[in-house]
């Protein structure tokens, strides 16, 4: 007799995916495409979770990052920054991503805030599309997603992760600017 185990071994980092994977599988039986939004606090693991989903599902998963929709310099005003999510060009995200969710292929302009330039991206609408980053659940978009995830983190862990990822010089920007904008 061939041994057929009824269990699977996975790393602990993937264990947190189980409820999300189960919900996604239920939705997949009802829909050809499942749109997942991952929003949350700075350094809470949004990009990591999106990468884990992309690794798990392989070619069936595409990821769009909200960082590609950072607000360009000419649009940055005090009034705009006073809005929730004002550092994101949510209008462009709505036009180029949300409006194209039903298309087989879509194009968008990826903004590089370090150079202030755009690059054209072409994306196939995969069976699982993950829209990852702060403000991906911005009210401006309505409720276009099939599955919404919001990640939280303690302030102590957030500080440790930001220092490790961005260094002490950038931590001050997070502490004084980006974290307060998320609250």
List each language-model region with its residue ranges.
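Hydrophobic positions on the alpha1 helix immediately C-terminal to the Walker A/P-loop
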Residues: 49
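Conserved nucleotide-sensing/catalytic segment adjacent to the nucleotide-binding pocket
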Residues: 62, 71-117, 128
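Conserved lysine of the Walker
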Residues: 46
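Small-molecule kinase domains that catalyze NTP-dependent phosphoryl transfer to phosphate-bearing small molecules
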Residues: 138, 167-183
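Walker A (P-loop) phosphate-binding loop of P-loop NTPases
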Residues: 43
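Charged, amphipathic alpha-helical linker segments immediately N-terminal to NTP-binding catalytic cores
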Residues: 1-16
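ATP-dependent NMP and nucleoside kinases share a basic, alpha-helical "lid"
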Residues: 117-165
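The Walker A (P-loop) glycine that initiates the GxxxxGKT/S ATP-binding motif of P-loop NTPases
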Residues: 40
């Amino acid at each position: 007799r061939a041994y057929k185990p009824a269990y699977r071994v996975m790393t602990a980092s993937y264990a947190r995916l189980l409820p999300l994977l189960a919900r996604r599988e239920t939705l997949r039986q009802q829909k050809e495409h499942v749109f997942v939004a991952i929003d949350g606090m700075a350094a809470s693991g949004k990009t990591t979770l999106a990468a884990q989903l992309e690794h798990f599902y392989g070619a069936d998963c595409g990821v769009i990052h909200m960082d590609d929709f950072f607000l360009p310099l000419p649009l940055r005003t005090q009034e705009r920054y006073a809005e929730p999510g004002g550092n994101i060009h949510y209008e462009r995200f709505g036009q180029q991503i949300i409006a194209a969710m039903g298309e087989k292929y879509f194009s968008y302009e990826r903004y590089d805030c370090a150079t202030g330039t755009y690059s054209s991206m072409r994306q196939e609408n995969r069976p699982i599309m993950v829209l990852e980053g702060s403000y991906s659940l911005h009210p401006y978009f309505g409720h276009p997603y099939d599955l919404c995830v919001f990640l939280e983190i303690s302030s102590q862990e957030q500080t440790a992760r930001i220092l490790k990822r961005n260094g002490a010089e950038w931590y001050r920007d997070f502490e004084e600017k980006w974290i307060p904008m998320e609250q």
